């Protein structure tokens, strides 16, 4: 970090005094100064971040006696969100742990006055608060709820944010502990907590992860802010109130007049006002709740526009630059937060600067290749290394550039208007319905990026041509700059192109013990992932679950048990195990428990960048991911490799190649047999009917007496014993050889059915 700061200061000295094109015309001078200004401001922002990250303060969870936990009101603000989203959230709330649950008061704060929300509140046995007017938007809604409740602490959740079972236990402990300490201190020595902010994470891939085919390669775009930036601000008491997943003291809210209603980012403003009053606020880096990230580009742009306008408006109205009630470190952090939203202009200038020179012949920076290698390169490399190290491999400069390039065309005008006091009059709630836009409705969002791509290609061509014409390598600097920007632009175009959404429900990684039964056989296994529409379970042995019949699945976690009804939709191999995927047709009487188990176990999004991936991989994935794929298989019964020589009742010798309970693949020489009876062991005979030929000597037969065998528990046990004998009895090497041949095919459709569940 010190090395980077030193090189950055040296670089700035060189840039300020030696590189501004003062003799190349007014356009060059303006462009050169604009680039220099955004570089200086960006580096000041980086220095603030370096200061914060130099000695991070992680609040230690205190030990609190059960009787010391105070009363708390849980407010879930809603306006027009779908009922199924509200159900998940309130279900998470009612399952939160607390020593005395009578001290937890949960309320729907309904700004839409909807009958169905009131009915849901009654069904879940929680409070319901509505209001007839919408004055003050979300802040007004929460203030109205405050006037009707009385607990000393208030937990706020957005309508889609599902708390985990330990949310209150891991947030309220700080307040309870501080209360106890304050009782032993005189008033002037007491420390009063304002709020505890926990990360806002998401159980669905955000648009950057999903549209760029990187769900398993990059963390959620917001993770860096909530898990690193926020926690780093603890030591300066400048943690930003994020509006959800937070516990606030009623006293602090009353001291600042409630939630701030004069900004469309009421959370940002309210947090600043609380800290102005001297309250101490902490951010935690442990995920205690998860929500639904915007699922379409229009909603994402609307959300970021509101955040940008709201932060700039708040900075202006609360006089962040000159207020005496904030310490210098607090002012610096909040000003950096406001400046962050001008990244759209910074990104535009970074992209246009090399284009101005290479495409239009306008000089922006006056320098030589040697100077760039001496002053810029060490600063650039050390900055990249610092960001990666300080972010704990959550964020890199490359991905920051991609995120900014995607959004900058849509934020430039709103931030400019807000800077001059032309504010957004109407509060827009971010759409979070789980549906996605059609690709043909979003192409026009890519027009700015397409124009810049064309200009960049022209500039790249000119640099290459000039290099060959002059024999000089000075143009390599501009060429590198253009290619770097072009990569970001191409990734932005890929992002805007979107990606078709197949899933109706988000699928979570859930590893819990399960039992499956059809009333004839019962199998025990371990779940792998689950959604509201389906679940996949690993079994040690194949089981005869008919895809045309219903099965009952019981899933257990450390506290609850859920029993649901479904049917098998896909069976594949996973190593030496069998993966059964079931659709869920009915949650029976276990909906609350099943929903809780799914969302409380949320762990499936990546928390770090995939270090093995490169920019080439990013482009390759986005090209191949958009290539139509064929699904080769859709197996709903386990296909079991077998190598058993058997004689039919007529004396014909055949070899069983594989078996899936309903069909049998045989190989034999000689005349084709249209039908035969095949005894596998004593008391177990298969009645076969010819279906088709595969190759020269392989024949597929249907098992005509499958229904009778399937419904007979004794026959089922004989079949299982026969499979174990011939699958593992000296044939493992043969089986593995056959499995490897099919591995590529199976991998292509392993989750094909689950994609829609």
Language model features: what each stretch is:
Residues 1, 18-30, 51, 55-64, ...:
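Basic/Trp-rich segment in TM-proximal cytosolic loops or flexible interdomain/linker regions
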Residues 1-68, 121, 344, 468-497, ...:
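N-terminal membrane-anchoring/stem segments of glycan-assembly enzymes
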Residues 52, 129-153, 165-264, 276, ...:
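Long helical/loop segments within the catalytic core of UDP-sugar-dependent glycosyltransferases
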Residues 71-73, 105, 269:
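Cell-envelope/extracellular polymer assembly enzymes that use nucleotide-activated donors
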Residues 91-103:
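Short, acidic, metal-binding catalytic loop of nucleotide-sugar glycosyltransferases
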Residues 109-117, 133-134:
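A conserved acidic beta->alpha catalytic loop
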Residues 158-162:
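The conserved acidic donor/metal-binding loop of glycosyltransferases
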Residues 438-757:
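Structured alpha-helical
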């Amino acid at each position: 970090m010190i090395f980077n700061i030193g090189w950055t200061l040296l670089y700035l000295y060189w840039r300020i005094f030696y590189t501004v094109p003062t003799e190349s015309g007014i356009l060059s001078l303006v462009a050169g100064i604009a680039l220099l200004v955004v570089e200086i401001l960006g580096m000041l922002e980086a220095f603030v971040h370096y200061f914060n990250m130099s000695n991070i303060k992680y609040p230690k969870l205190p030990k609190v006696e059960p009787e010391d936990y105070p009363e708390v009101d849980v407010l879930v603000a809603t306006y027009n969100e779908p009922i199924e989203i509200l159900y998940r959230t309130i279900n998470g709330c009612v399952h939160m742990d607390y020593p005395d649950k009578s001290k937890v008061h949960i309320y729907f704060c309904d700004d839409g006055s909807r009958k169905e929300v009131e009915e849901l509140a009654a069904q879940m046995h929680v409070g319901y608060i509505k209001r007839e007017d919408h004055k003050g938007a979300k802040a007004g809604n929460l203030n109205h709820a405050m006037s009707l409740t009385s607990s000393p602490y208030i937990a706020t959740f957005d309508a889609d944010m599902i708390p985990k079972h330990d949310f209150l236990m891991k947030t309220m402990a700080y307040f309870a502990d501080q209360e106890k300490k304050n009782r032993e201190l005189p008033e002037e020595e007491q420390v009063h907590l304002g709020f505890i902010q926990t990360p806002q994470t998401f159980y669905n891939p955000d648009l950057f992860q999903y549209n760029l085919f990187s769900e398993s390669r990059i963390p959620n775009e917001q993770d860096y802010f909530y898990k690193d930036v926020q926690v780093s601000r603890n030591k300066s008491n400048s943690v930003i109130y994020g509006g959800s997943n937070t516990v606030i003291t009623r006293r602090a809210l009353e001291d600042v007049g409630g939630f701030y209603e004069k900004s469309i980012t009421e959370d940002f403003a309210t947090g600043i006002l609380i800290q102005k009053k001297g309250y101490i606020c902490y951010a935690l880096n442990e995920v205690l709740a998860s929500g639904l990230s915007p699922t379409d580009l229009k909603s994402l742009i609307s959300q970021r526009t509101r955040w940008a306008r709201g932060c700039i408006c708040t900075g202006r109205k609360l006089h962040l630059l000159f207020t005496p009630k904030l310490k210098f470190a607090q002012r610096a952090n909040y000003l950096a937060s406001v400046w962050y939203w001008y990244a759209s202009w910074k990104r535009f200038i970074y992209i246009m600067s090399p284009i101005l020179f290479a495409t239009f012949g306008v000089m922006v920076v006056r320098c030589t290749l040697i100077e760039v290698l001496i002053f810029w390169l060490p600063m650039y490399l050390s900055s990249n290394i610092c960001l990666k190290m300080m972010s704990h491999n959550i964020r890199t400069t490359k991905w920051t550039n991609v995120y900014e390039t995607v959004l900058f065309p849509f934020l430039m005008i709103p931030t400019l208007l807000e800077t001059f006091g032309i504010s957004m009059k109407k509060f827009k709630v971010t759409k979070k319905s789980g549906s996605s836009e059609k690709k043909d409705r979003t192409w026009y969002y890519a027009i700015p990026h397409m124009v810049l791509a064309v200009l960049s290609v022209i500039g790249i061509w000119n640099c290459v041509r000039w290099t060959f014409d002059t024999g000089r390598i000075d143009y390599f600097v501009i060429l590198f700059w253009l290619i770097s920007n072009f990569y970001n632009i191409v990734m932005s175009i890929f992002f805007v192109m979107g990606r078709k959404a197949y899933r109706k429900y988000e699928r979570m990684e859930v590893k819990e013990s399960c039992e499956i039964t059809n009333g004839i056989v019962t199998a025990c296994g371990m779940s792998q992932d689950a959604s509201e529409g389906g679940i996949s379970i690993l079994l040690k042995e194949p089981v005869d679950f008919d895809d045309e019949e219903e099965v009952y699945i019981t899933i257990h976690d450390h506290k609850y048990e859920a029993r649901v009804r479904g049917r098998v939709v896909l069976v594949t191999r996973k190593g030496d195990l069998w993966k059964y995927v079931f659709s869920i047709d009915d949650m029976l009487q276990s909906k609350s428990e099943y929903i809780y188990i799914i969302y409380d176990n949320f762990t499936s999004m990546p928390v770090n960048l995939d270090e093995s991936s490169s920019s080439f991989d990013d482009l390759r994935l986005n090209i191949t991911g958009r290539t139509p794929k064929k699904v080769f298989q859709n197996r709903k019964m386990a296909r079991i490799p077998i190598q058993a020589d058997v004689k039919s009742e007529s004396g014909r010798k055949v070899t069983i190649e594989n078996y899936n309970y309903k069909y049998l693949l045989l190989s034999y020489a000689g005349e084709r047999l249209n039908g035969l009876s095949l005894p596998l062991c004593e008391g177990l005979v298969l009645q076969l009917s010819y279906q088709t030929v595969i190759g020269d000597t392989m024949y597929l037969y249907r098992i005509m007496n499958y229904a009778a065998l399937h419904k007979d528990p004794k026959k089922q046990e004989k079949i299982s014993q026969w499979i174990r004998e011939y699958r593992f009895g000296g044939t493992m090497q043969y089986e593995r050889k056959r499995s490897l041949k099919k591995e590529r095919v199976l991998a292509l459709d392993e989750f094909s059915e689950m994609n829609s569940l």
